[in-house]
């Protein structure tokens, strides 16, 4: 192994992960999700309405919004007010798609759930941390509906988590931090279920290419990370 990780981790090692449940008072579900130095506040809000195209269908809806605080990065970023950047739109669509895959919208009934992911501090992996924390916030919100008698059982079908994997000097590394993300020739974001079925794979090469064998290594490493993240999600939710 030629590349030495700045924080001393092994290639297959996650950064320290923590879920601080019920971080805010008024949302149906909330969690401060931390992955190393990346911190994302994820909240789930439930409203008794659906988009017009679902009226009368008996089916619910889930969507997501993603933002970064101006001071989340080393240099202050301007707030996105009237128009969202292409990056922000792409990320919030990814979060929404990923979390819709794990919920039975028919069983939810005609309700809408909004997952808000606000990045308080960014050290790479903000979209993957948003998905992983967003699932926890969603599960907390649905548990409240069950406790209030508004749902008989949870419409969640399976856990969802996401992780990044990158190739640096030809070797795969799990859960990149910012210095590694900047150094990586190949960068992947992988979203999986608790059963390790794939939901989404995003991968790009910069000034290089990768082989099918390296792609398999990347997905194998992602599986290890997802398995650990789902276990941590379950541990956190068991204490709710």
Curated annotation (Swiss-Prot):
Function noted in UniProt: Phosphorolytic 3'-5' exoribonuclease that plays an important role in tRNA 3'-end maturation. Removes nucleotide residues following the 3'-CCA terminus of tRNAs; can also add nucleotides to the ends of RNA molecules by using nucleoside diphosphates as substrates, but this may not be physiologically important. Probably plays a role in initiation of 16S rRNA degradation (leading to ribosome degradation) during starvation.
Alphabetical list of SUPFAM superfamilies matching this protein: Ribonuclease PH domain 2-like, Ribosomal protein S5 domain 2-like
Query: What's the encoding gene here?
Result: rph
Q: Which GO terms describe its biological process?
A: rRNA catabolic process; rRNA processing; tRNA processing
Q: What is its EC number?
A: 2.7.7.56
Q: Which UniProt keywords apply?
A: Nucleotidyltransferase, RNA-binding, rRNA processing, Transferase, tRNA processing, tRNA-binding
Q: What class of enzyme is it?
A: transferase
**CDD domains to which the protein is assigned, alphabetical:** RNase_PH_bact (cd11362)
Question: Subunit composition?
Answer: Homohexameric ring arranged as a trimer of dimers.
Q: Which residues bind phosphate?
A: 87, 125-127
Identify the Pfam families for this entry: RNase_PH, RNase_PH_C
Q: What is this protein called?
A: Ribonuclease PH
The record's section on HAMAP family has: RNase_PH (MF_00564)
GO terms, molecular function: 3'-5'-RNA exonuclease activity; tRNA binding; tRNA nucleotidyltransferase activity
Q: Which reaction does it catalyse?
A: tRNA(n+1) + phosphate = tRNA(n) + a ribonucleoside 5'-diphosphate
The organism's superkingdom is given as: Bacteria
List, alphabetically, the InterPro entries matched.
ExoRNase_PH_dom1, ExoRNase_PH_dom2, ExoRNase_PH_dom2_sf, PNPase/RNase_PH_dom_sf, Ribosomal_Su5_D2-typ_SF, RNase_PH, RNase_PH_bac-type, RNase_PH_CS
So what family is this one in? Answer: Belongs to the RNase PH family.
């Amino acid at each position: 192994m030629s590349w030495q990780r700045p924080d001393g981790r092994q290639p297959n090692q996650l950064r320290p992960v923590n879920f601080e449940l019920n971080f805010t008072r008024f949302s149906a579900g909330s969690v401060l999700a931390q992955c190393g130095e990346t911190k994302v506040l994820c909240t789930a809000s439930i409203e008794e309405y659906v988009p017009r195209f679902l009226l009368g269908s008996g089916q619910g809806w889930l969507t997501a919004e993603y933002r970064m605080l101006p001071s989340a990065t080393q240099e202050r970023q301007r707030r996105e007010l009237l128009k969202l950047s292409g990056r922000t739109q792409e990320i919030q669509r990814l979060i929404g798609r990923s979390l819709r895959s794990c919920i039975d919208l028919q069983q939810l009934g005609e309700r809408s759930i909004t997952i808000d992911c606000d990045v308080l501090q960014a050290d790479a992996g903000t979209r993957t941390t948003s998905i992983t924390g967003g699932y926890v916030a969603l599960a907390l919100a649905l548990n409240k509906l069950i406790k209030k008698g508004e749902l008989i059982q949870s419409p969640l079908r399976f856990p969802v988590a996401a992780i990044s994997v990158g190739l640096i000097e030809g070797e795969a590394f799990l859960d990149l931090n910012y210095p590694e993300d900047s150094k990586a020739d190949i960068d992947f974001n992988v979203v999986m279920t608790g059963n390790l079925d794939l939901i989404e794979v995003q991968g790009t090469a910069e000034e290089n290419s990768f082989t099918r064998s390296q792609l398999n290594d990347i997905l194998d490493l992602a599986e290890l990370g997802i398995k650990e993240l789902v276990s941590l999600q379950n541990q956190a939710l068991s204490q709710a």
